[in-house]
UniProtKB/Swiss-Prot annotation:
Induction: The expression of the ergot alkaloid synthesis cluster which leads to the synthesis of fumigaclavines is positively regulated by the brlA and stuA transcription factors. Pathway: Alkaloid biosynthesis; ergot alkaloid biosynthesis. GO terms for biological process: ergot alkaloid biosynthetic process; small molecule biosynthetic process. It comes from Aspergillus fumigatus (strain ATCC MYA-4609 / CBS 101355 / FGSC A1100 / Af293). It is an enzyme of class 1 (oxidoreductase). Glycans are attached at N240, N327. Belongs to the cytochrome P450 family. This is Cytochrome P450 monooxygenase easK. Coiled coil: none annotated. The gene is easK. Its EC number is 1.-.-.-. Cytochrome P450 monooxygenase; part of the gene cluster that mediates the biosynthesis of fumiclavanine C, a fungal ergot alkaloid. DmaW catalyzes the first step of ergot alkaloid biosynthesis by condensing dimethylallyl diphosphate (DMAP) and tryptophan to form 4-dimethylallyl-L-tryptophan. The second step is catalyzed by the methyltransferase easF that methylates 4-dimethylallyl-L-tryptophan in the presence of S-adenosyl-L-methionine, resulting in the formation of 4-dimethylallyl-L-abrine. Ergot alkaloids are known for their toxic effects on humans who consume contaminated grains or livestock that graze on grasses harboring ergot alkaloid-producing fungi. Due to their strong affinity for monoamine neurotransmitter receptors they may also have clinical uses such as treatment of migraines, Parkinson's disease and cerebrovascular insufficiency. Residues 1-16 form the signal peptide. Pfam families: p450.
Amino acid sequence: MLLLTFTLPVVTLLLAHIIRSWFRLRHIPGPFWAKITDLWREHHYIKGDYGDRPMAPYFAIPSLLGMESAMDQIQQELEDQICRRVTIDVVLWMRLFSLESLHWIAFSNKLGYLSEGKDTDGILSILQSKFIGLAGQLCGWIHRTTLRFHFPKSCTGTAVAPSQRKASHRDLLAHFMDASQKNPETLEERGVLGATISTIFAGTDTTGTSLTFFMYYLIKHPAALARLQEELDSAVRSGNLSYPPKWVEVSTLKYLQAVFKETLRLHSTARMSLYRVVGPEGLDLCGERLPSGTNLGCFGYTAHRNEPIYGRDAALFRPERWIEASNDTLLSMERASL
């Protein structure tokens, strides 16, 4: 009975997906199976020109810097909310900030998370449950179906509306729409919405978590906090740090960058094994011979605590390692960072 209860909804979803796919593709001439599956799309992925390539320029630093000023008001709103409180839930507020920021960058629209101080329509709850990630691991059709049913309409509605008109300024949606118009065969219009929403899903949890641990380690290590405060104060006194701070300014603050790198080293946002394919010559690793074509993966937790690369104190939070390292050692540490 329990097995039937579980399998019946799955079979129903599978049949619904097949029927929907058949009606969507039935007019396309070609092999029979092309009418009930979109596996034929895989040649775009093999060629490397499906989706990612048309959008890649918009994730480059020059393009992202064009959105920097749009973040100032979100940053100011976070500061105002924090100043009104004696204590704050850092985990919650960093996630609210990252979600509000990414939604503003993507759609030029505020969700009201910071002003309300809570998860108003349940996006954070969805991320916390890992529902979308698990569904995506199971099967593509489950992922597409569940994403459609569970993503709040407050976001999808905001995303769809601008697609009917010219964007007033250059947010991510406007950039992706341009990419779709220039590359209609490799980036469909419906893919624009998916790509924009995926950016929010991918960035909210990782950004919020990174900011949370950034503050956690500074609070836990007063000496590091004091050194960072001195660097910031010195930059302000010398006129090298404005308010709100700019990326070109903070990117030159060595200790600040070291703290960020050390935080991401100890708490990487990549919580999965990132695979690489062994080259034609094969690979000898830990006494084992791995043949060409083997998928070899390693978790960031393990790679980032590799003592031959990061030192005997690799398990400790010590931002100074990024400043004291020789050029060769620094290059090795950065290459090992996942």
